[in-house]
């Protein structure tokens, strides 16, 4: 038997005690319900702590650390696994129950702490929401949170999640900066099916990319298009036409251009128009000179055609010496070289041209005589007219005052012209010189190129002696040589002069000039009497021709002829 008083002395089996404990737990369902309430309370406290930690993570890290410690301490005290949601019954269940009982005594303190923490959370988010805590008679309590408080908690949680996501985005942006961005436009150009068909718009856009001006100019200059070549040709043609027209206008101005140069070497100098007024003056002078050239050319042609019309014109407004001068000038156009004529036009002749002075003023001036080559026969007057027209056309369409003309070409043209004049036969000249002169013109004074007076006795030539005397004079001319050292034709003075009274003509160097002038007078006058003591009017080329045909052996013509 077992004595009840001795029950404490008998050791009890531990397994029996555990079974008894289990039976006691089953017998006490109220205690299990209390444990469930405590578990719910701890879970709620855990959630509140977590939310409080998330809300105050930036404000007060120390409080967060303390709350985390408190939460972990509570969790460790009851050994709750929230994911499982139940209590783990340990072998020392009795000790656990003792701890639970001790914790029941601390429930009001925990309740107050939880209430204070929750009020802090609610005051931080939005004040005015209260939390009701219901406690049972067994000191088991639970929280009943109204709907508004729950919504505020959810909003706070969502804000925290957004902040966390924004922080992650900031970190991600730093990482995205290092990533190469793909250009969708370039990817679309390299499509897989672009080899099959290419849109013409893409080709046009690719061709319309602007190039640099240097590349464009290089491309245009290297590869001429037909339109560009045609435009260049038309532009060059227009420029050539304007060039020739300007040069023809300037070549016809002998009286103005003669004052712009100083010597024969000034052929390399150019005349440049400085102002618009110069152009207008040049145009007016060109107009006047063209009119005078036309009048002189028409007068010389009509004089060659018939002596009667010439004789009738002489009695008009023009004087005999003017027509003689014009005719001699027109003949000299064919004999003189092109370069010499250009040098004549640009050589200084102070008021010696018939365009620049009146006949009355020219008669009173002491001028120089011109030495002319012998006139050609009358049968060749048609050929002379053609050559005269060709020479005039060349002069109208050439600009003699260009720097392009060289002295070498000048000398070549002079030598060719001199040879051409030498090849003229004496027979054609003799037939022209054999016509007797019916008039008896008195002797006239002529001045040479060096302002030295030379007597030329113009006496009547008898028919019987004319052939022999003229033949001897022709032989004297042919016996004289030519000196081309300076490019200018000079007739050497003949050593033997014939100072006869009636059959010979006295010469001091002007042999060819006197013969030609006498034959011109004898042909043209046809019985008319020339006025006495009248000085021969010089032509516009009198001074350069005197230079060209000077018969003096020395260079005295360089000392100044004017």
UniProtKB/Swiss-Prot annotation:
InterPro entries from the UniProt entry: Slain
Superkingdom field: Eukaryota
Comp. bias intervals (Low complexity): 295-311, 345-355
Disordered: annotated segments: 292-313, 344-381, 409-562
Single GO BP term: microtubule nucleation
Disulfide bond sites: none
Sequence ranges of Polar residues compositional bias: 356-370, 424-442, 465-531, 539-553
Record keywords: Coiled coil
This protein's GO CC annotations: microtubule plus-end
Classification via PANTHER family: NASCENT POLYPEPTIDE-ASSOCIATED COMPLEX SUBUNIT ALPHA, MUSCLE-SPECIFIC FORM (PTHR22406), SLAIN MOTIF-CONTAINING PROTEIN-LIKE (PTHR22406:SF5)
Family membership: Belongs to the SLAIN motif-containing family.
Descriptive protein name: SLAIN motif-containing protein-like
